[in-house]
From Swiss-Prot:
The gene is fscD. Belongs to the G-protein coupled receptor Fz/Smo family. This is Frizzled/smoothened-like sans CRD protein D. One of its GO terms (biological process) is cell surface receptor signaling pathway. Residues 28-85, 132-162, 222-244, 307-346 are extracellular. It comes from Dictyostelium discoideum (Social amoeba). The keyword Signal applies.
Length: 440
């Protein structure tokens, strides 16, 4: 009797086969409360409202997709979330150090130029990105509940935590890419010895931040922030909004960055060997960071473009998996999701974001300029610290004496990184890092 009943149920399900996300036929019915694992049954009284709240229904049934989605196995999801926790935490502390170093808390106002301000904005943007995406120290115990507040429900902007983290994540991403492009242009202007006034500097800084605010807050009106099927945090959901409010600006910034790098290399190549060595000595670290970040942005851009082009394939894979679930309703464990998106490639995509903070520490944290900023700061240059650590006082005094000697006896000029470069009577031999002219 049990075998006959099992056969009838399987026959009924096959005959009433449905499509996934509009790929299945509409108007199907299933036994009340029945959904093969890992699909989740949702007793919906207001289907449209449930969809807006983040439930992904399978065709016209009351079965919903699990959260996180079926695109990866649970182990693969845990792997990428654990990476976001470990790499993100390291990156977060590295960025905190860099932000404090270049902020008014430590760096004196007269040490600010368009380049140092650009670096500060860049690091702040990356910091917002790594602390609002994936898993962090302060929400380890939440597990998937942070982005899956209820079984089978993906978080939406109606969920306060999702909206707040999505806003900060989008703002951080846009800030990072815009100021990365600005820094790459600034490095070229530095080598070309181009100076701008304070008014011009403030103007383009304000414009960049206005663009960032528009690209961040405009999608809220269309309720576009939420947790997606391949994401590890809340962000823009619809493809057209992702392209219009992020990837199109990213593409433009990548073009600007590529052109700037080519022009920088061209300028370095044109000068004599002696000047070339000085240029490389002064600009090698910023240039390497710009090139590394360019390669990471390009990888993320290519990965996103590739996965977007295969959205149809992803739905076909999930459709095949769900067919298997309903055909083998009594033994769903034999069904497996075929690989639609490479798990290692997806892992590296999210790792790239966290790698930027670590790279920032390597190229801007362990430098003479960082040491000089801290030694000049109030925190290490006060009577209490000098009494507590006498050796630090002598080092600070040596720094001041050295700087004074450079300015008076060698006709040196300080750069925005607090490093001196000898002047020459030949204007072609004078290297000036980016500065802001005090004249308006």
């Amino acid at each position: 009797m049990f075998i006959i009943l099992k056969f009838l149920i399987s026959f009924f399900l096959i005959c009433n086969f449905f499509n996934y996300n509009d790929h299945f036929a509409s108007g199907q019915t299933l036994p009340p409360g029945f959904c093969p694992s890992p699909l989740i049954y949702r007793n919906s009284t207001n289907r449209q409202n449930d969809i807006e709240n983040g439930y992904l229904f399978i065709g016209q049934t009351n079965c919903t997709s699990p959260c996180p989605s079926l695109i990866f196995s649970e182990n693969e999801w845990h792997r990428v979330y654990n990476m976001s926790l470990i790499a993100g935490t390291i990156s977060m502390f590295a960025l905190i150090f860099l932000i404090i170093t270049y902020s008014p808390l430590v760096n004196k106002y007269n040490g600010y130029t368009r380049h140092t301000v650009g670096i500060l904005f860049l690091f702040c943007g990356i910091f917002l990105t790594v602390t609002t995406d994936g898993r962090q120290l302060w929400d380890i115990d939440l597990g998937f509940e942070k982005y899956c507040p209820e079984p089978g429900r993906f978080a939406r902007q109606s969920d306060t935590k999702c909206l707040v983290t999505a806003i900060f994540f989008q703002y951080g991403c846009v800030t990072s890419i815009l100021w990365w492009a600005a820094i790459s242009v600034d490095l070229w202007m530095t080598i070309r010895k181009v100076k701008i006034s304070k008014l011009q500097f403030i103007t383009y800084a304000v414009i960049l931040n206005i663009i960032t605010l528009i690209l961040t807050f405009a999608p809220i009106a269309s309720k576009q922030y939420g947790y997606g099927e391949a994401a590890i945090g809340c962000w823009l959901m619809d493809l057209k909004y992702q392209v219009g409010y992020f990837w199109a600006p990213v593409g433009f910034c990548l073009c600007v960055g590529c052109v700037s790098i080519v022009l920088i290399i061209r300028e370095i190549y044109k000068v004599s060997d002696a000047i070339k060595k000085k240029l490389l000595a002064k600009h090698l670290k910023p240039l390497m960071l710009i090139i590394l970040m360019l390669s990471e942005f390009i990888y993320m851009f290519i990965f996103y473009s590739y996965t977007t082009s295969r959205r149809g394939h992803y739905h076909d894979v999930v459709e095949k998996y769900i067919r298997c679930l309903f055909i083998n309703a009594s033994n769903p464990s034999i069904c497996e999701v075929d690989v639609s998106i490479s798990s290692p490639a997806h892992f590296f995509f999210h790792f790239c974001m966290r790698l930027m903070g670590i790279e920032g520490l390597i190229f801007f944290g362990f430098t003479r300029q960082t040491k000089r900023i801290w030694l000049r700061s109030f925190w290490l240059n006060n009577s209490f610290i000098k009494k507590l650590i006498p050796s630090l006082s002598s080092i600070s005094s040596d720094e001041k004496t050295s700087n004074s000697s450079h300015r008076t006896t060698r006709g040196c000029r300080e750069t925005e990184f607090g490093e001196s470069i000898e002047q020459s009577n030949d204007p072609e031999h004078f290297i000036e890092l980016s500065g802001v002219d005090s004249k308006n």
